C-alpha cells in the first residue's frame, strides 16, 4: 500500500505514534465501521503511548541506575527484615511528591542498591526525574568540578532532580571538604526534592563518618530525623530467575 499524504504530514509534525496508528487503520478494513471520533481517539491514544514510552527511555538513560531493577521483581518472601507495609507505601511514589527522604541500611548482599534502583525505576515510570550516584565517585566528581569551574553547575544539577539516589554512603570517613560538599547537596535538596541514601552502616553510626562534627550535625539534621527508614537483613530480594530467562538472579555476594 502506497504511503498516504496524511501519514507524511503526521511524520512532518512529529506525530509518529499517530502516523503508525493511521497506517495500521488503513490496513484493517474493520476499522471502517468505527465512527470518526472513535478512530481519532485511537490515533490520539497511540500518540500518547508513543510519547510516554520515549519519555521513559529518556528518564532511564538520564537516571543511569546501577541495576535494572523493578518493584515487580521484588521477592517479598526472601525479603527478611523488609517492612513490607512501608515498602508498599514507598512504591506508590507519594513520598516523592511530598519531598520526603528514604534511608536504606543493611549488610552487603541484602539488596540495598537493588531496592533503591527499583524505586528509582518506578519514579521514572511515574514521569519523575531521577539521578543515581555512588557517593565515593560523586565526591570525586565534585572535587574535580571545583577545580575546573563546574562545581556550582554540578550542584545545581543535583538539586533539580525530583529523586536523587546516593548509594554506598559511609564506605570510608569523609574529609572536612567532602563533608561540606555533602552538606551543600543535602541543604540544596532539603524540602525541595527527595533523596534515597543507602549504607552498610546503621544510621546511628553515620555521625562518625563525617570528620567535622558541626558539619555532621548539619547533614544529619536535614537528612535523618524525618526520613523513612528501611533496615534490611537476610538474603537477596530478587525473585529467582524464570524459565524464560527474563529475570536475572541478584548475586548476594555483589548485591548492595
Give residue spans per PLM region.
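Conserved P-loop
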Residues: 82-160, 207
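Alpha-helix C-capping/helix-to-loop hinge sites
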Residues: 25-29, 77, 145
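Clamp-loader machinery-focused feature within the broader ASCE/P-loop NTPase space
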Residues: 50, 56-89, 97
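Short, residue-level hotspots on alpha-helical faces of the histone-fold
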Residues: 42, 46, 118-122, 188, ...
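Interdomain "pre-motor" coupling segment immediately N-terminal to P-loop NTPase/helicase cores
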Residues: 7, 11, 15-67
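Short hinge/gating elements
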Residues: 8, 24-28, 72-73, 101-105, ...
